[in-house]
């Protein structure tokens, strides 16, 4: 199934850590990125803009292959 706006996703640690996207930002990736669901709020090509968690945090752009759709 294709990921679309509103889809809940979770980051895949093995694909995100050490990636170009991770190197372009703070090297410490907070656990909430891997442990909480994120909502896809925009899509541009192979990249997804994702809002993680219920607390106010900035959105992040990740490649579609760095996340997995959550069941449910």
Swiss-Prot record:
It is a peripheral membrane protein. It comes from the Bacteria. It catalyses: a plastoquinone + NADH + (n+1) H(+)(in) = a plastoquinol + NAD(+) + n H(+)(out); a plastoquinone + NADPH + (n+1) H(+)(in) = a plastoquinol + NADP(+) + n H(+)(out). GO terms for cellular component: plasma membrane-derived thylakoid membrane. Disulfide bonds: none annotated. It is an enzyme of class 7 (translocase). Belongs to the complex I NdhO subunit family. NDH-1 can be composed of about 15 different subunits; different subcomplexes with different compositions have been identified which probably have different functions. This is NAD(P)H-quinone oxidoreductase subunit O. The gene is ndhO.
């Amino acid at each position: 199934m294709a990921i679309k706006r509103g889809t809940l996703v979770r980051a895949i640690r093995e694909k995100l850590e050490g990636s170009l996207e991770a190197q372009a930002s703070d090297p410490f990736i907070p656990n909430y990125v891997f442990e909480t669901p994120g909502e896809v709020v925009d899509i541009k090509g192979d990249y997804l803009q994702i809002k993680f968690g219920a607390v106010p945090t900035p959105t992040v752009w990740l490649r579609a292959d760095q996340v997995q759709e959550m069941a449910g």
